């Protein structure tokens, strides 16, 4: 029974059309008829969102064409038609890119190869270590934790102590009880991870490790299973995390992300705090706490 449930949520090539169908249905159900400028007759709609024929009308295509697309049929919209459908559904930039990925995987375009292993070049390791007072880490494909500096490991978790296959941010967030305790707003952080992972999965639909990761999380976490089924996609490039650290107490850290040249699937995360705040004091305390260990390793 468990394997059957996991298969329902695993991102396989055979399920690409279903992924497209589910995404379009969800986007249509969230549409706002008034925002779309559709006339209303004063009657309450039986179901929320837009009707198929309304999306087709707004996009300038036939109802039959849009219906076949929403059913996941293997048809290839032109860029103009795809843009019209995205506008009709009022998709944001990330959702548009996700739709493009899903449409692309249903066509006969050459498949994109996914390297089996991502590596961080030595200069980036040096950069991480140079950021002594700021936590920093590099995430790769499917949110794998490729590298982190000592302060990031002290703030979040000692990722280097995990087996290589377990060094994954989403996996840690959902399956490690300490992560649930660390994030004051765990639900928001976990939802964001699901949305980022779904966007990444659409970009590499044939990646075996991504498929295995999604399957494992779907079988192990009811929260992941529920949020994955919502088909929401987003990539947060900055924000704030509120933490309840077991050593230094509560603090808030802001983060910014940078996509690294040479590998668009590698992202540098740098965490900062406002100066002269209790959060900065907490981070400074953590720096002093790990300093002896860092010094001894250097010697």
Where is each model-derived feature located?
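Amphipathic, well-packed alpha-helical segments that form the structural scaffold of globular domains
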Residues: 25-32, 100, 104, 129, ...
């Amino acid at each position: 029974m468990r394997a059957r449930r996991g298969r329902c949520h695993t991102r396989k090539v055979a399920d690409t059309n279903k992924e497209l169908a589910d995404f379009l249905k969800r986007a249509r159900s969230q549409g706002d008829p008034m925002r779309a400028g559709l006339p209303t007759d004063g009657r309450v709609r039986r179901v929320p969102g837009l009707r198929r024929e309304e999306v087709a009308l707004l996009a300038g295509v036939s109802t039959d064409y849009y219906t076949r697309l929403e059913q996941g049929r293997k048809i290839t919209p032109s860029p103009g038609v795809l843009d019209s459908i995205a506008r009709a559904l009022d998709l944001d930039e990330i959702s548009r890119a996700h739709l493009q990925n899903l449409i692309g995987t249903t066509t006969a375009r050459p498949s994109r190869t996914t390297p089996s292993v991502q590596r961080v070049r030595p200069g980036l390791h040096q950069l991480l270590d140079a950021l002594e007072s700021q936590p920093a880490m590099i995430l790769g494909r499917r949110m794998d934790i490729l590298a982190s500096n000592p302060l990031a490991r002290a703030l979040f978790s000692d990722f280097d102590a995990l087996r290589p296959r377990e060094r994954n941010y989403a996996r840690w967030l959902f399956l490690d009880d300490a992560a649930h305790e660390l994030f004051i707003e765990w639900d928001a952080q976990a939802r964001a991870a699901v949305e980022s992972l779904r966007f990444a999965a659409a970009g590499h639909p044939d990646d075996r490790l991504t498929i295995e990761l999604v399957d494992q999380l779907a079988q192990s976490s009811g929260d992941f299973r529920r949020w994955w089924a919502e088909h929401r996609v987003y990539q947060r490039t900055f924000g704030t995390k509120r933490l309840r650290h077991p050593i230094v107490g509560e603090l808030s850290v802001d983060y910014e992300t940078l996509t690294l040249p040479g590998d668009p699937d590698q992202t540098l995360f740098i965490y900062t705090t406002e100066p002269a705040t209790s959060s900065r004091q907490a981070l400074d305390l953590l720096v002093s706490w790990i300093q002896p260990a860092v010094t001894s390793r250097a010697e």
